[in-house]
Amino acid sequence: MLSIVLAIVAVVVDQVTKWLVATRMALHSEIEIIPGFFSLQYVHNTGAAFGMLRNGRWFFVAVAALAVAGILYYLRQPESRHPLLRVALGLVMGGAVGNMIDRIATGRVVDFLLFYWRDYYFPNFNVADICVTVGVGLLFLHLVLVERKGTA
């Protein structure tokens, strides 16, 4: 249940933040939040993370759907009971669904978080991307700290 609740919260926060950006900012506009470091910049992304594999709409929808189906199946297994694992899978699932909604509805994802330092700009991303990244990091942590000790 923890994974499902966390996934739902992630999807809601992701979709609300994207809606706020899309309805209050012009495409490609930027609002500097921390000068020289962080801005909100509204862009569309038809690819994956960092703009890779542009125009792969249905490929990414299929990958996200398969990932969600796999996670839902795994969550029914006894070995998925560890809380850290459930949090990790909930975040990954929520992020996958958040971006999948955009891809199905519009064929692109709204990205708006932009970090930069001098001439280096990290690619724009969104809340769903954060959820997937943190979820995968927690999954790795679970594998290293829990699975290796055999305490899952």
UniProtKB/Swiss-Prot annotation:
Keyword Transmembrane: yes
EC numbers on record: 3.4.23.36
Catalytic activity: Release of signal peptides from bacterial membrane prolipoproteins. Hydrolyzes -Xaa-Yaa-Zaa-|-(S,diacylglyceryl)Cys-, in which Xaa is hydrophobic (preferably Leu), and Yaa (Ala or Ser) and Zaa (Gly or Ala) have small, neutral side chains
Top EC class for this record: hydrolase
Listed GO biological process terms: proteolysis
Active-site residues, record numbering mapped to chain: 111, 129
Keyword annotations: Aspartyl protease, Cell membrane, Hydrolase, Membrane, Protease, Transmembrane, Transmembrane helix
Record GO cellular component, one term: plasma membrane
Membrane topology: Multi-pass membrane protein
Top-level division of the source organism's lineage: Bacteria
A Gene Ontology molecular function term of the record: aspartic-type endopeptidase activity
Residues spanning the membrane: 55-75, 87-107, 125-145
Pathway: Protein modification; lipoprotein biosynthesis (signal peptide cleavage)
Compartments where found: Cell membrane
Keyword Cell membrane among UniProt keywords: yes
InterPro entries referenced in this protein's UniProt entry, alphabetically: Peptidase_A8
Family the entry assigns: Belongs to the peptidase A8 family.
Function, in words: This protein specifically catalyzes the removal of signal peptides from prolipoproteins.
Stated name of the protein: Lipoprotein signal peptidase
